[in-house]
């Protein structure tokens, strides 16, 4: 099923999801390094900035994902896509709360933002798995396959 959110035939959603997934997942090791005392305040700042960058980067991923969601017609595929969508709609507010809890935080540092981010990263992994299933198993945003090698016109 070919994506409607594409440039030159290349679907955009798989490109855009790399940004929030990568940044959100990297924020957790930054948090752990800081909270276990293995690094200085720069790790705390890195966690905050990667979370905030992931939130900004999620916007084009959400928009292109929503466009692709609109092309799904098969019921089983729609169920998987709906679960993927719901998880992603939970992720954004979860990470926004984590950012607000960190903003301007002074000692003693709370573990709540780290705990929230941990669950966010777990949900990101589950959602990413489902997104991969939508592409590889259900063919969302995948061009129709050619029947044999290309021929000269």
Model-predicted regions and their roles:
Residues 1-153:
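Polytopic transmembrane helical bundles with strong interfacial aromatic enrichment
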């Amino acid at each position: 099923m070919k994506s409607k959110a594409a440039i030159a035939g290349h679907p955009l959603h798989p490109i855009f999801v790399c940004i929030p997934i990568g940044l959100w997942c990297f924020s957790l090791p930054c948090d752990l390094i800081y909270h276990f005392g293995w690094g200085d305040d720069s790790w705390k700042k890195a966690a905050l900035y990667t979370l905030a960058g992931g939130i900004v980067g999620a916007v084009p991923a959400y928009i292109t994902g929503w466009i692709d969601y609109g092309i799904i017609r098969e019921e089983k595929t729609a169920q998987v896509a709906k679960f993927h969508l719901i998880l992603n709609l939970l992720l954004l507010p979860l990470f926004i709360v984590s950012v607000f809890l960190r903003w301007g935080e002074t000692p003693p540092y709370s573990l709540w933002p780290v705990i929230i981010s941990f669950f966010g990263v777990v949900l990101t992994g589950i959602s990413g798995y489902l997104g991969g299933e939508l592409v590889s198993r259900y063919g969302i945003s995948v061009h129709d396959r050619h029947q044999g090698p290309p021929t000269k016109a």
